[in-house]
């Protein structure tokens, strides 16, 4: 079956001297992996540069449902980046988000709303001119909505401790260890009220920001099966001092 779809690059693994295994989140079919042969010369369309983290591409291929690795027939850039490849901060964020999405969408089928959210977020990051230190935090919070486990911050009126397991506030300390103290809980409430346009208004120290990311990643681990440690988090910890 011939398929034409837009797709977002999540992960690229070198396979031999002239092939790549590329994981995509596609608009029409959800998560797919491809074996891509790249030329050693400058000729040909399948250039390695196309398959960088979060690149938004147009794909054309013959879909084989029983195959674990699809084969591309044609590829082109749908959204050319103007700033992400040239900004160390945006590049660091894009690597972090690509790794996050690579784990979070492993079993994801076609999901138009999720795909549109990710694509719009990538475009926003590329065009952003102001402070972006909170971008990945806002992204992770909003992404949790699409996976069905967005925390209930409205329950904050009835308790001081945010329960990471139940995704809501508790009046008393939960019986398990996965909860936040009052200070972290109130910061979480503030962050959940932000969007990309207002995120620059909320200032945090490097330590506070890293703590927020740690908390949200713990929340993901509790609600997404087999969610691993994020290797790229170490890069972000150093970027926004």
What are these regions (language model features)?
Residues 1-241:
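Non-catalytic alpha-helical scaffolds and adjoining flexible linkers that form interface surfaces
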């Amino acid at each position: 079956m011939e398929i034409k779809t837009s797709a977002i690059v999540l992960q690229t693994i070198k396979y031999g001297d002239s092939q790549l295994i590329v994981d995509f989140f596609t608009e029409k079919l959800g998560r797919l992996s491809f074996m891509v042969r790249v030329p050693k010369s400058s000729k040909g369309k399948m250039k390695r540069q196309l398959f960088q983290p979060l690149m938004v591409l147009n794909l054309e291929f013959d879909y084989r449902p029983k195959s674990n690795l699809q084969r591309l027939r044609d590829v082109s850039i749908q959204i050319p980046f103007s700033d992400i490849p040239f900004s160390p901060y945006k590049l660091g964020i894009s690597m972090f988000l690509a790794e996050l999405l690579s784990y979070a969408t492993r079993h994801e089928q076609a999901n138009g709303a999720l795909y549109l959210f990710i694509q719009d977020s990538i475009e926003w990051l590329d065009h952003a001119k102001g402070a972006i230190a909170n971008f990945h935090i806002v992204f992770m919070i909003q992404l949790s909505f699409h996976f069905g486990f967005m925390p209930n911050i409205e329950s904050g009126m009835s308790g001081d401790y945010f329960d990471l397991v139940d995704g809501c506030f508790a009046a008393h300390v939960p019986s398990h260890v996965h909860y936040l103290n009052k200070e972290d809980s109130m910061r979480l409430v503030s962050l959940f009220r932000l969007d990309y346009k207002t995120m620059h208004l909320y200032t945090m120290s490097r330590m506070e920001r890293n703590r927020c990311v740690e908390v949200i990643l713990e929340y993901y681990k509790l609600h997404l099966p087999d969610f691993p440690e994020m290797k790229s988090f170490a890069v972000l910890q150093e970027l926004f001092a």
